[in-house]
Protein backbone atom coordinates (compact mmCIF):
# COMPACT_ATOMS: atom_id res chain seq x y z
CA UNK A 1 0.00 0.00 0.00
CA UNK A 2 2.84 2.37 0.84
CA UNK A 3 4.44 1.74 -2.56
CA UNK A 4 1.18 2.60 -4.36
CA UNK A 5 0.92 5.89 -2.45
CA UNK A 6 4.53 6.76 -3.31
CA UNK A 7 3.90 6.02 -7.00
CA UNK A 8 0.99 8.44 -7.27
CA UNK A 9 2.58 11.08 -5.03
CA UNK A 10 5.62 11.05 -7.34
CA UNK A 11 3.33 11.52 -10.35
CA UNK A 12 1.52 14.45 -8.70
CA UNK A 13 4.84 16.09 -7.75
CA UNK A 14 6.22 15.57 -11.26
CA UNK A 15 3.18 17.17 -12.89
CA UNK A 16 3.17 20.01 -10.35
CA UNK A 17 6.83 20.74 -11.03
CA UNK A 18 6.38 20.45 -14.79
CA UNK A 19 3.35 22.73 -15.07
CA UNK A 20 4.19 25.00 -12.10
CA UNK A 21 1.10 24.06 -10.19
CA UNK A 22 -1.32 21.17 -9.85
CA UNK A 23 -3.97 20.95 -12.57
CA UNK A 24 -6.48 18.13 -12.06
CA UNK A 25 -7.34 17.97 -15.77
CA UNK A 26 -3.67 17.34 -16.57
CA UNK A 27 -3.56 14.65 -13.88
CA UNK A 28 -6.61 12.96 -15.44
CA UNK A 29 -4.87 12.75 -18.83
CA UNK A 30 -1.87 11.05 -17.26
CA UNK A 31 -3.63 8.73 -14.82
CA UNK A 32 -4.51 5.88 -17.22
CA UNK A 33 -1.12 5.33 -18.93
CA UNK A 34 0.78 5.78 -15.69
CA UNK A 35 -1.56 3.43 -13.80
CA UNK A 36 -0.83 0.72 -16.37
CA UNK A 37 2.87 1.42 -15.98
CA UNK A 38 2.67 1.37 -12.18
CA UNK A 39 0.97 -2.03 -12.25
CA UNK A 40 3.94 -3.36 -14.20
CA UNK A 41 6.32 -1.74 -11.71
CA UNK A 42 4.59 -3.42 -8.77
CA UNK A 43 4.93 -6.78 -10.52
CA UNK A 44 8.64 -6.09 -11.05
CA UNK A 45 9.04 -5.24 -7.36
CA UNK A 46 7.34 -8.52 -6.47
CA UNK A 47 9.55 -10.50 -8.86
CA UNK A 48 12.60 -9.00 -7.13
CA UNK A 49 11.31 -10.14 -3.69
CA UNK A 50 10.82 -6.60 -2.43
CA UNK A 51 7.67 -7.73 -0.61
CA UNK A 52 9.40 -10.56 1.24
CA UNK A 53 10.08 -9.81 4.91
CA UNK A 54 13.14 -12.06 4.60
CA UNK A 55 15.06 -9.29 2.82
CA UNK A 56 13.36 -6.30 4.50
CA UNK A 57 16.70 -5.24 5.94
CA UNK A 58 18.96 -2.34 4.97
CA UNK A 59 21.78 -4.45 3.61
CA UNK A 60 23.51 -5.22 0.33
CA UNK A 61 20.99 -7.90 -0.66
CA UNK A 62 18.07 -5.50 -0.33
CA UNK A 63 19.90 -2.60 -2.00
CA UNK A 64 20.93 -4.69 -5.01
CA UNK A 65 17.39 -6.06 -5.44
CA UNK A 66 15.97 -2.54 -5.19
CA UNK A 67 18.43 -1.12 -7.72
CA UNK A 68 17.79 -3.96 -10.20
CA UNK A 69 14.03 -3.48 -9.91
CA UNK A 70 14.30 0.28 -10.45
CA UNK A 71 16.56 -0.12 -13.48
CA UNK A 72 14.26 -2.67 -15.10
CA UNK A 73 11.21 -0.55 -14.25
CA UNK A 74 12.85 2.49 -15.81
CA UNK A 75 13.76 0.62 -19.00
CA UNK A 76 10.24 -0.76 -19.35
CA UNK A 77 8.90 2.77 -18.87
CA UNK A 78 11.03 4.00 -21.76
CA UNK A 79 9.76 1.15 -23.94
CA UNK A 80 6.13 1.93 -23.07
CA UNK A 81 6.27 5.67 -23.65
CA UNK A 82 8.83 5.99 -26.43
CA UNK A 83 8.52 2.80 -28.46
CA UNK A 84 5.01 1.35 -28.07
CA UNK A 85 2.85 3.35 -30.50
CA UNK A 86 -0.28 4.96 -29.11
CA UNK A 87 0.52 4.13 -25.49
CA UNK A 88 0.16 7.79 -24.49
CA UNK A 89 -3.39 7.76 -25.88
CA UNK A 90 -2.82 10.61 -28.25
CA UNK A 91 -4.01 13.76 -26.49
CA UNK A 92 -1.02 14.66 -24.37
CA UNK A 93 2.23 12.75 -24.31
CA UNK A 94 3.03 11.73 -20.73
CA UNK A 95 6.48 10.66 -21.95
CA UNK A 96 7.62 14.29 -21.63
CA UNK A 97 7.13 13.91 -17.88
CA UNK A 98 8.48 10.38 -17.56
CA UNK A 99 12.05 11.24 -16.60
CA UNK A 100 10.93 13.70 -13.94
CA UNK A 101 8.47 11.15 -12.55
CA UNK A 102 11.14 8.43 -12.39
CA UNK A 103 13.66 10.69 -10.61
CA UNK A 104 11.14 11.83 -7.99
CA UNK A 105 9.87 8.28 -7.51
CA UNK A 106 13.36 6.83 -7.00
CA UNK A 107 14.15 9.40 -4.29
CA UNK A 108 10.82 8.91 -2.48
CA UNK A 109 10.74 5.14 -2.91
CA UNK A 110 14.31 4.62 -1.75
CA UNK A 111 13.72 6.77 1.32
CA UNK A 112 10.36 5.14 2.12
CA UNK A 113 11.69 1.59 1.83
CA UNK A 114 14.76 2.26 3.95
CA UNK A 115 12.59 3.93 6.59
CA UNK A 116 10.16 0.99 6.49
CA UNK A 117 12.96 -1.54 6.91
CA UNK A 118 14.48 0.42 9.78
CA UNK A 119 11.17 0.77 11.62
CA UNK A 120 10.19 -2.88 11.12
CA UNK A 121 13.62 -4.11 12.19
CA UNK A 122 13.82 -1.95 15.31
CA UNK A 123 10.24 -2.08 16.56
CA UNK A 124 10.13 -2.60 20.30
CA UNK A 125 6.74 -4.26 20.07
CA UNK A 126 7.79 -7.84 19.38
CA UNK A 127 6.37 -11.14 20.54
CA UNK A 128 8.52 -12.53 23.36
CA UNK A 129 9.11 -16.13 22.36
CA UNK A 130 10.54 -19.27 23.95
CA UNK A 131 11.39 -22.64 22.46
CA UNK A 132 10.59 -25.63 24.67
CA UNK A 133 12.63 -28.64 23.63
CA UNK A 134 15.88 -28.91 21.74
CA UNK A 135 16.58 -30.52 18.36
CA UNK A 136 18.21 -29.52 15.05
CA UNK A 137 15.00 -27.89 13.80
CA UNK A 138 14.74 -25.87 17.02
CA UNK A 139 18.31 -24.64 16.54
CA UNK A 140 17.66 -23.72 12.91
CA UNK A 141 14.45 -21.92 13.86
CA UNK A 142 16.23 -20.02 16.64
CA UNK A 143 18.92 -18.88 14.21
CA UNK A 144 16.24 -17.74 11.78
CA UNK A 145 14.46 -15.66 14.43
CA UNK A 146 17.72 -14.09 15.63
CA UNK A 147 18.82 -13.27 12.08
CA UNK A 148 15.48 -11.73 11.08
CA UNK A 149 14.14 -9.41 13.82
CA UNK A 150 11.83 -7.84 11.22
CA UNK A 151 9.67 -10.97 11.45
CA UNK A 152 8.37 -9.63 14.77
CA UNK A 153 9.62 -12.25 17.25
CA UNK A 154 12.13 -11.83 20.06
CA UNK A 155 13.58 -15.15 21.18
CA UNK A 156 14.05 -14.90 24.94
CA UNK A 157 15.18 -18.38 25.88
CA UNK A 158 15.32 -22.07 25.05
CA UNK A 159 14.37 -24.70 27.62
CA UNK A 160 15.74 -28.18 27.10
CA UNK A 161 15.90 -31.38 29.11
CA UNK A 162 19.45 -32.57 28.58
CA UNK A 163 22.18 -33.15 31.13
CA UNK A 164 24.78 -31.41 28.99
CA UNK A 165 24.34 -27.94 27.51
CA UNK A 166 26.44 -27.16 24.44
CA UNK A 167 27.17 -23.44 24.68
CA UNK A 168 28.84 -23.37 21.25
CA UNK A 169 25.36 -23.28 19.72
CA UNK A 170 23.40 -20.04 20.04
CA UNK A 171 25.73 -18.43 22.61
CA UNK A 172 23.65 -15.22 22.62
CA UNK A 173 20.45 -16.98 23.74
CA UNK A 174 19.61 -17.93 27.31
CA UNK A 175 19.39 -21.73 27.54
CA UNK A 176 17.83 -23.32 30.62
CA UNK A 177 18.29 -26.95 31.55
CA UNK A 178 15.25 -28.90 32.68
CA UNK A 179 11.52 -28.16 32.77
CA UNK A 180 11.22 -27.55 36.51
CA UNK A 181 9.31 -24.36 37.38
CA UNK A 182 8.30 -23.98 33.74
CA UNK A 183 5.48 -21.52 34.38
CA UNK A 184 7.59 -19.31 36.65
CA UNK A 185 10.39 -19.24 34.09
CA UNK A 186 8.10 -18.23 31.23
CA UNK A 187 6.43 -15.55 33.33
CA UNK A 188 9.76 -14.17 34.53
CA UNK A 189 10.92 -13.75 30.92
CA UNK A 190 7.51 -12.28 29.97
CA UNK A 191 7.05 -14.92 27.29
CA UNK A 192 3.75 -14.68 25.42
CA UNK A 193 4.34 -17.49 22.92
CA UNK A 194 6.10 -20.83 23.35
CA UNK A 195 7.15 -23.10 20.50
CA UNK A 196 7.00 -26.76 21.51
CA UNK A 197 9.09 -29.52 19.91
CA UNK A 198 7.54 -32.97 19.28
CA UNK A 199 9.65 -34.64 21.99
CA UNK A 200 7.93 -32.60 24.71
CA UNK A 201 4.54 -34.13 23.91
CA UNK A 202 5.84 -37.56 24.86
CA UNK A 203 5.76 -36.62 28.56
CA UNK A 204 2.33 -36.46 30.19
CA UNK A 205 3.81 -34.44 33.05
CA UNK A 206 5.16 -31.82 30.66
CA UNK A 207 1.84 -31.64 28.84
CA UNK A 208 0.14 -30.89 32.15
CA UNK A 209 2.72 -28.18 32.90
CA UNK A 210 2.05 -26.58 29.53
CA UNK A 211 -1.69 -26.80 30.08
CA UNK A 212 -1.35 -24.99 33.40
CA UNK A 213 0.31 -22.06 31.61
CA UNK A 214 -2.68 -21.32 29.36
CA UNK A 215 -4.46 -19.26 32.04
CA UNK A 216 -1.43 -16.95 32.15
CA UNK A 217 -1.97 -15.81 28.54
CA UNK A 218 0.83 -17.88 27.05
CA UNK A 219 0.09 -19.24 23.60
CA UNK A 220 1.57 -22.56 22.50
CA UNK A 221 2.34 -23.61 18.93
CA UNK A 222 3.98 -26.79 17.73
CA UNK A 223 7.39 -26.57 16.15
CA UNK A 224 6.31 -28.07 12.83
CA UNK A 225 3.62 -25.45 12.14
CA UNK A 226 5.69 -22.48 13.30
CA UNK A 227 8.79 -23.72 11.47
CA UNK A 228 6.72 -24.06 8.31
CA UNK A 229 5.30 -20.55 8.65
CA UNK A 230 8.70 -18.92 9.18
CA UNK A 231 10.93 -20.93 6.84
CA UNK A 232 8.34 -21.86 4.18
CA UNK A 233 9.41 -25.50 4.29
CA UNK A 234 8.31 -28.65 6.11
CA UNK A 235 10.70 -30.05 8.76
CA UNK A 236 11.26 -33.67 7.76
CA UNK A 237 12.44 -34.64 11.24
CA UNK A 238 9.20 -33.39 12.81
CA UNK A 239 6.65 -35.16 10.58
CA UNK A 240 5.45 -38.70 10.02
CA UNK A 241 2.90 -40.58 7.90
CA UNK A 242 0.06 -39.03 9.89
CA UNK A 243 1.18 -35.59 8.72
CA UNK A 244 0.58 -36.63 5.11
CA UNK A 245 -2.86 -38.02 5.93
CA UNK A 246 -3.83 -34.75 7.59
CA UNK A 247 -2.22 -32.27 5.19
CA UNK A 248 -1.98 -33.74 1.70
CA UNK A 249 -5.43 -33.93 0.15
CA UNK A 250 -5.66 -34.75 -3.56
CA UNK A 251 -9.45 -34.51 -3.71
CA UNK A 252 -9.54 -30.86 -2.63
CA UNK A 253 -7.12 -29.97 -5.42
CA UNK A 254 -9.08 -31.43 -8.36
CA UNK A 255 -10.40 -28.09 -9.67
CA UNK A 256 -6.97 -26.52 -9.25
CA UNK A 257 -5.24 -29.40 -11.05
CA UNK A 258 -7.69 -29.14 -13.97
CA UNK A 259 -7.16 -25.40 -14.33
CA UNK A 260 -3.40 -25.82 -13.96
CA UNK A 261 -3.34 -28.37 -16.77
CA UNK A 262 -5.23 -26.00 -19.08
CA UNK A 263 -2.91 -23.13 -18.13
CA UNK A 264 0.19 -25.30 -18.68
CA UNK A 265 -1.00 -26.46 -22.11
CA UNK A 266 -1.82 -23.04 -23.53
CA UNK A 267 1.16 -21.18 -22.05
CA UNK A 268 3.61 -23.91 -23.12
CA UNK A 269 2.11 -23.94 -26.63
CA UNK A 270 2.52 -20.17 -26.96
CA UNK A 271 6.06 -20.11 -25.58
CA UNK A 272 7.14 -23.10 -27.67
CA UNK A 273 5.80 -21.46 -30.84
CA UNK A 274 7.57 -18.18 -30.09
CA UNK A 275 10.82 -19.88 -29.10
CA UNK A 276 11.00 -21.87 -32.34
CA UNK A 277 12.29 -18.70 -34.02
CA UNK A 278 15.49 -19.01 -31.98
CA UNK A 279 16.00 -22.76 -32.25
CA UNK A 280 17.98 -22.70 -35.56
CA UNK A 281 20.37 -20.09 -34.14
CA UNK A 282 20.84 -22.05 -30.90
CA UNK A 283 21.35 -25.30 -32.84
CA UNK A 284 23.94 -23.70 -35.13
CA UNK A 285 25.98 -22.27 -32.25
CA UNK A 286 25.88 -25.63 -30.41
CA UNK A 287 27.16 -27.48 -33.51
CA UNK A 288 29.88 -24.91 -34.18
CA UNK A 289 30.97 -24.88 -30.54
CA UNK A 290 31.62 -28.59 -29.98
CA UNK A 291 31.12 -32.03 -31.47
CA UNK A 292 27.94 -33.89 -30.73
CA UNK A 293 24.18 -33.69 -31.26
CA UNK A 294 22.13 -30.55 -30.74
CA UNK A 295 19.76 -32.20 -28.28
CA UNK A 296 20.42 -34.16 -25.11
CA UNK A 297 17.94 -36.90 -24.18
CA UNK A 298 17.61 -38.21 -20.66
CA UNK A 299 15.28 -40.32 -18.52
CA UNK A 300 13.66 -38.65 -15.52
CA UNK A 301 11.21 -39.75 -12.81
CA UNK A 302 7.73 -38.26 -13.14
CA UNK A 303 4.45 -38.29 -11.26
CA UNK A 304 3.83 -41.52 -9.38
CA UNK A 305 7.43 -42.63 -9.96
CA UNK A 306 6.78 -43.20 -13.68
CA UNK A 307 9.86 -42.65 -15.90
CA UNK A 308 9.64 -40.32 -18.89
CA UNK A 309 12.05 -38.85 -21.41
CA UNK A 310 13.10 -35.22 -21.46
CA UNK A 311 14.88 -33.38 -24.25
CA UNK A 312 17.18 -30.40 -23.67
CA UNK A 313 19.57 -28.39 -25.78
CA UNK A 314 23.00 -29.89 -25.22
CA UNK A 315 25.03 -27.63 -22.96
CA UNK A 316 27.97 -29.95 -22.17
CA UNK A 317 30.68 -31.70 -24.13
CA UNK A 318 29.23 -34.93 -25.52
CA UNK A 319 30.84 -38.36 -25.35
CA UNK A 320 27.85 -40.64 -25.91
CA UNK A 321 25.14 -41.00 -28.55
CA UNK A 322 22.46 -39.34 -26.39
CA UNK A 323 24.46 -36.13 -26.16
CA UNK A 324 25.56 -36.95 -22.62
CA UNK A 325 28.94 -36.33 -21.01
CA UNK A 326 29.09 -39.19 -18.50
CA UNK A 327 30.44 -42.09 -20.50
CA UNK A 328 33.70 -41.97 -18.57
CA UNK A 329 32.61 -40.56 -15.21
CA UNK A 330 29.17 -42.12 -14.78
CA UNK A 331 26.09 -40.22 -13.54
CA UNK A 332 27.05 -36.99 -11.82
CA UNK A 333 24.94 -34.09 -10.56
CA UNK A 334 25.51 -30.69 -12.13
CA UNK A 335 27.59 -28.31 -10.05
CA UNK A 336 28.37 -24.61 -10.06
CA UNK A 337 30.83 -23.66 -12.81
CA UNK A 338 30.61 -27.23 -14.07
CA UNK A 339 33.77 -27.95 -16.15
CA UNK A 340 31.75 -30.25 -18.42
CA UNK A 341 29.76 -27.28 -19.81
CA UNK A 342 30.72 -25.73 -23.14
CA UNK A 343 31.20 -21.97 -23.41
CA UNK A 344 27.82 -21.51 -25.08
CA UNK A 345 26.37 -24.17 -22.80
CA UNK A 346 27.21 -22.01 -19.79
CA UNK A 347 25.08 -19.24 -21.29
CA UNK A 348 22.24 -21.66 -22.03
CA UNK A 349 22.29 -22.95 -18.46
CA UNK A 350 22.54 -19.49 -16.88
CA UNK A 351 19.47 -18.32 -18.81
CA UNK A 352 17.79 -21.76 -18.66
CA UNK A 353 17.45 -21.64 -22.44
CA UNK A 354 18.65 -25.26 -22.57
CA UNK A 355 15.26 -26.22 -21.13
CA UNK A 356 13.18 -24.76 -23.97
CA UNK A 357 12.55 -28.21 -25.56
CA UNK A 358 10.98 -29.30 -22.25
CA UNK A 359 8.00 -27.12 -23.15
CA UNK A 360 6.94 -30.12 -25.25
CA UNK A 361 6.99 -32.29 -22.11
CA UNK A 362 4.57 -29.79 -20.54
CA UNK A 363 2.28 -29.85 -23.57
CA UNK A 364 1.97 -33.65 -23.57
CA UNK A 365 1.43 -33.71 -19.80
CA UNK A 366 4.65 -35.26 -18.49
CA UNK A 367 5.61 -32.04 -16.71
CA UNK A 368 4.15 -28.78 -15.45
CA UNK A 369 5.57 -25.28 -15.29
CA UNK A 370 5.70 -25.54 -11.49
CA UNK A 371 6.48 -28.59 -9.39
CA UNK A 372 9.34 -30.56 -7.82
CA UNK A 373 12.41 -31.12 -9.97
CA UNK A 374 12.26 -34.26 -12.11
CA UNK A 375 15.24 -36.31 -10.93
CA UNK A 376 17.22 -38.95 -12.81
CA UNK A 377 16.62 -42.63 -11.85
CA UNK A 378 20.25 -43.07 -10.78
CA UNK A 379 20.02 -40.22 -8.27
CA UNK A 380 16.46 -41.11 -7.28
CA UNK A 381 17.52 -44.51 -5.95
CA UNK A 382 20.28 -43.00 -3.81
CA UNK A 383 18.25 -40.06 -2.51
CA UNK A 384 15.17 -42.06 -1.50
CA UNK A 385 17.47 -44.28 0.59
CA UNK A 386 18.90 -41.37 2.58
CA UNK A 387 16.03 -38.86 2.68
CA UNK A 388 12.74 -39.66 4.44
CA UNK A 389 9.58 -39.18 2.36
CA UNK A 390 11.64 -38.46 -0.75
CA UNK A 391 9.24 -40.41 -2.98
CA UNK A 392 6.32 -38.25 -1.82
CA UNK A 393 7.70 -35.52 -4.09
CA UNK A 394 6.17 -37.49 -6.94
CA UNK A 395 2.61 -37.13 -5.70
CA UNK A 396 2.35 -34.38 -8.31
CA UNK A 397 3.92 -33.69 -11.71
CA UNK A 398 7.51 -32.46 -11.79
CA UNK A 399 8.01 -28.87 -12.87
CA UNK A 400 10.22 -26.77 -15.08
CA UNK A 401 10.64 -24.59 -11.99
CA UNK A 402 9.52 -25.02 -8.41
CA UNK A 403 9.51 -23.71 -4.86
CA UNK A 404 12.67 -25.65 -3.98
CA UNK A 405 14.50 -24.27 -7.02
CA UNK A 406 13.45 -20.73 -6.08
CA UNK A 407 14.36 -20.96 -2.39
CA UNK A 408 17.41 -23.22 -2.55
CA UNK A 409 18.62 -23.44 -6.15
CA UNK A 410 20.46 -26.48 -7.44
CA UNK A 411 21.51 -29.27 -5.11
CA UNK A 412 24.53 -31.46 -5.79
CA UNK A 413 24.61 -33.50 -2.56
CA UNK A 414 22.32 -35.54 -0.33
CA UNK A 415 22.31 -32.70 2.22
CA UNK A 416 21.24 -30.22 -0.47
CA UNK A 417 18.43 -32.48 -1.62
CA UNK A 418 17.32 -33.02 1.98
CA UNK A 419 16.70 -29.28 2.18
CA UNK A 420 14.97 -29.21 -1.20
CA UNK A 421 12.55 -31.99 -0.24
CA UNK A 422 11.39 -29.86 2.69
CA UNK A 423 10.55 -27.05 0.26
CA UNK A 424 8.91 -29.50 -2.15
CA UNK A 425 6.59 -30.79 0.56
CA UNK A 426 5.69 -27.22 1.51
CA UNK A 427 4.69 -26.60 -2.10
CA UNK A 428 2.70 -29.83 -2.36
CA UNK A 429 0.77 -28.94 0.78
CA UNK A 430 0.13 -25.29 -0.13
CA UNK A 431 0.00 -25.41 -3.92
CA UNK A 432 -2.48 -23.08 -5.58
CA UNK A 433 -2.74 -21.09 -8.78
CA UNK A 434 -1.64 -17.88 -7.01
CA UNK A 435 1.35 -19.73 -5.52
CA UNK A 436 2.22 -21.02 -9.00
CA UNK A 437 2.10 -17.51 -10.48
CA UNK A 438 4.34 -16.31 -7.66
CA UNK A 439 6.91 -19.01 -8.44
CA UNK A 440 6.78 -18.26 -12.17
CA UNK A 441 7.39 -14.56 -11.52
CA UNK A 442 10.29 -15.31 -9.17
CA UNK A 443 11.73 -17.67 -11.79
CA UNK A 444 11.78 -14.76 -14.23
CA UNK A 445 13.90 -12.86 -11.71
CA UNK A 446 16.36 -15.76 -11.52
CA UNK A 447 16.59 -15.90 -15.31
CA UNK A 448 17.20 -12.14 -15.53
CA UNK A 449 20.02 -12.49 -12.99
CA UNK A 450 21.51 -15.46 -14.86
CA UNK A 451 20.89 -17.67 -11.86
CA UNK A 452 20.85 -20.98 -13.70
CA UNK A 453 23.67 -23.47 -13.39
What are these regions (language model features)?
Residues 66, 70, 125-143, 293-316:
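Membrane-cytosol interface motif
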Residues 1-6, 56-58, 111-276:
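N-terminal hydrophobic signal-anchor/signal peptide
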Residues 1-124, 153, 453:
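Signature of alpha-helical transmembrane segments in polytopic membrane proteins
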Amino acid sequence: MGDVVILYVSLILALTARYRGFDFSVFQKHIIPFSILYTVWLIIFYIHNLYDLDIAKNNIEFSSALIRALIIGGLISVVFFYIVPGFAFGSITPKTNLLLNIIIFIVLFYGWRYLFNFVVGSLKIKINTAIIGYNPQAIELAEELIKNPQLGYKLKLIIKNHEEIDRTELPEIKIIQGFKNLRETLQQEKVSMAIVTPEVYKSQELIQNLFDCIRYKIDFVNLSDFYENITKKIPLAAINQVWFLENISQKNKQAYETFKRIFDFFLASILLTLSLLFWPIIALIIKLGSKGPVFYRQTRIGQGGKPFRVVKFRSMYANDQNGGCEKLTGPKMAEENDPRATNFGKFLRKTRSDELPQLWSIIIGDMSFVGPRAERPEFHQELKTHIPFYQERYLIKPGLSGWAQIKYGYGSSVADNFEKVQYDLYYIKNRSFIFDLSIILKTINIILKGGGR
